[in-house]
Amino acid sequence: MELFKDIKNLGKLVRLERIFNRESEKTVIVPMDHGVSNGPIKGLIDIRKTVNDVAEGGANAVLLHKGIVRHGHRGYGKDVGLIIHLSGGTAISPNPLKKVIVTTVEEAIRMGADAVSIHVNVGSDEDWEAYRDLGMIAETCEYWGMPLIAMMYPRGKHIQNERDPELVAHAARLGAELGADIVKTSYTGDIDSFRDVVKGCPAPVVVAGGPKTNTDEEFLQMIKDAMEAGAAGVAVGRNIFQHDDVVGITRAVCKIVHENADVEEALKEIRKK
């Protein structure tokens, strides 16, 4: 794929084609790692059903913690890529922004992963530990031919606006600088500023879904704008798995990401009954 022309590692290229659409060269990832940070929230109670629904809706990959893979594995129907999340931290911790490494690239390989991901809160206390982890894991991923997704967010007690374009651009660039193959980060709120984020990051950028939005139109417009700005895809959790029509909203997102549909056209996928 042209998107990954700078990657020469065959193992990475083979795996990346399992989580990206070969024709559009874009991806729709549904993270479901929230159980560690927030517990059994709505949409993640019956993990197998949710995985089934997003797969039927056309998602390219799901992102899970290692212990949930056995409970969410489909074993039938349409295939969906598997991304194992390496980081963990809880909302009830004295330091909820602290993320530690909870598994290895090697274990992810044994579980059949197509990629691994790591979470970095740029600007948080002791964030340097996460930078070290990212750099070392990037080296391991290169050795094994495993694609690495870095979730890079400006977060910390000194960060007043987590969507500040300069901070988001810095966080995204940091992920690429330390070896990530793909960077996931927050949408900055408008096309022009997010385009600058994409331009400043040598690695492909996928946009995070963020908090649950008030309307489908608001959510899908954000996806549309991010794609217009040059995003390589989306990584959306709550706005998909907490939707009343998980299959439909997944189809709507895929319609925009892979077919360049407008919001009104994508909304029709939700209204199908």
Swiss-Prot record:
The active site is at 33 (proton acceptor), 153 (proton donor), 184 (schiff-base intermediate with substrate). Keywords: Amino-acid biosynthesis, Aromatic amino acid biosynthesis, Schiff base, Transferase. Its EC number is 2.2.1.10. SUPFAM superfamilies: Aldolase (SSF51569). It is an enzyme of class 2 (transferase). Inhibited by NaBH4 in the presence of FBP. Optimum temperature is not reached at 100 degrees Celsius. The keyword GTP-binding does not apply. CDD domains: DhnA. It catalyses: 1-deoxy-D-threo-hexo-2,5-diulose 6-phosphate + L-aspartate 4-semialdehyde = 2,3-dioxopropyl phosphate + 2-amino-2,3,7-trideoxy-D-lyxo-hept-6-ulosonate. GO terms for molecular function: acyltransferase activity, transferring groups other than amino-acyl groups; fructose-bisphosphate aldolase activity; hydro-lyase activity; transketolase or transaldolase activity. 1-deoxy-D-threo-hexo-2,5-diulose 6-phosphate binds at residues 33-37, 153-155, 209-210, 237-238. Gene3D superfamilies: Aldolase class I. InterPro entries: ADH_synthase, Aldolase_TIM, DeoC/FbaB/LacD_aldolase, DeoC/FbaB_aldolase, FbaB-like. It comes from the Archaea. GO terms for biological process: amino acid biosynthetic process; aromatic amino acid family biosynthetic process. Pfam families: DeoC. Catalyzes a transaldol reaction between 6-deoxy-5-ketofructose 1-phosphate (DKFP) and L-aspartate semialdehyde (ASA) with an elimination of hydroxypyruvaldehyde phosphate to yield 2-amino-3,7-dideoxy-D-threo-hept-6-ulosonate (ADH). Plays a key role in an alternative pathway of the biosynthesis of 3-dehydroquinate (DHQ), which is involved in the canonical pathway for the biosynthesis of aromatic amino acids. Can also catalyze the cleavage of fructose-1,6-bisphosphate (FBP) to glyceraldehyde-3-phosphate (GAP) and dihydroxyacetone phosphate (DHAP). Belongs to the DeoC/FbaB aldolase family. ADHS subfamily. HAMAP family: ADH_synthase. PANTHER family: 3-HYDROXY-5-PHOSPHONOOXYPENTANE-2,4-DIONE THIOLASE (PTHR47916:SF1), FRUCTOSE-BISPHOSPHATE ALDOLASE CLASS 1 (PTHR47916). Homodecamer. This is 2-amino-3,7-dideoxy-D-threo-hept-6-ulosonate synthase. The lineage of its organism: Archaea, Methanobacteriati, Methanobacteriota, Methanomada group, Methanococci.
